[in-house]
Amino acid sequence: MEQRVAITGIGAVSPLGNTALATWAAMCAGTCGIGPITHFDTDAFAVKVAAEVKGFDGNEYFGKHDAKHLDPCVQFAMAASDEAMHDAGFDVEGAIDRERLGVYVGSGVGGMQTLVDNVHTIADRGPRRASPYMIAMMIPNMASGNIAIRHKAKGPTLPVVTACATSAHAVGEAFRAIKHGYADAIVAGGAEAAIIPDAVAGFTSCRALTTNPDPATACRPFDADRDGFVMGEGACVLVLEGMEHAQARGAHIYAEVVGYGNTDDAYHITSPDPDAAGIARAISLAVAEGDVKPSEGLYINAHGTSTKLNDSSETAGIKRALGEDAARAAHVSSTKSMTGHMIGATGAIEVMACAMALEQGVVPPTINYHTPDPACDLDYTPNRAVRADLTWALSTNLGFGGHNAAIALRRYARS
């Protein structure tokens, strides 16, 4: 028998705050989390700004001994998972059968800082000086591995790696596993910590990043003057749980996950398909599985990267999937205008925004939106959050390699 699936825990470490609720409050306030890059000297770089996590001290959180054996990417993931598990009430002994608790937490690039540090060490001091922890700190599955160890989660584990769609696919696959009875609950999400010279240089070379040095206007999704995305970092983790399991223990339910679409453009390694067939099909699959009725109040948290190709293609995909009238009636926004592009964490934090929007009836804005683009002609909730009577939400994400994901949610009706 298929199970309904609830979101019962949320956790985040983001450029807007080091907890989920702080992040959500900042989104609703239209706060910009972008600023000058402080992680390294940018004098030789065309890119000057990023959305950095602020005030998170791994040494303080984990202790110096443990922190030095955890890449920042994994530190973010573990901190977010701690918050989500506590929020769900699963940090208490006996709260859940640990053999029925899974972990689906991925990363787009994994422990890149660890890899780069060790490459320099090997080049300067020889191969014998490589850290014995190098491999375990850099491989992308170790966010899931460390979270499973920390929370004694012995159920299904599936670290997902699909670039910018990573944590959307993680949430979607967790939804499927619970729906079909493979777990009672799954910790799902993603993390990234790639604001380092090597990653910024690489993204700059493929012309993905904005070179606008003004933090207040650098990221402007769907605006006619957009010219690239802003790198972000952090983590977001959600606890997905079978509805009956959650209701039986009296858990707080933020929203219900009802549908999931997973497709590929099969078009280009970095560029989205201009005809938007792939993302449109992902949306259509999620809408069909969830029996979504857009006319009843729909919020779409769009991928909205602030690149010329993505934003126009995604707009076309939304209209292709929903039809012109339903697409124009929907509330749309890109919270990347505030968080930057958190790569492997971005899908989960945007699903979190959808869940909170449904629960509170608030649509977070797309900030820095000033000049309309004829190719992007939907209601993008410009610059200020709005109140709305919402029943449904969609979160869409696209990743290098042509990966597309769409997650459909429904407002939870409390009796």
Predicted regions and their residues:
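Active-site-proximal alpha-helical scaffold in enzymes
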Residues: 77-90, 140-144, 148-192, 230-251, ...
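Condensing-enzyme catalytic core mediating Claisen C-C bond formation in acyl metabolism
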Residues: 4-8, 31-35, 214-290, 298-299, ...
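Conserved beta-ketoacyl condensing-enzyme motif
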Residues: 7, 20-23, 28-163, 191-200, ...
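Glycine-/small-residue-rich "gating" segment that lines the acyl/pantetheine channel
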Residues: 124-131, 169-172, 176, 192-248, ...
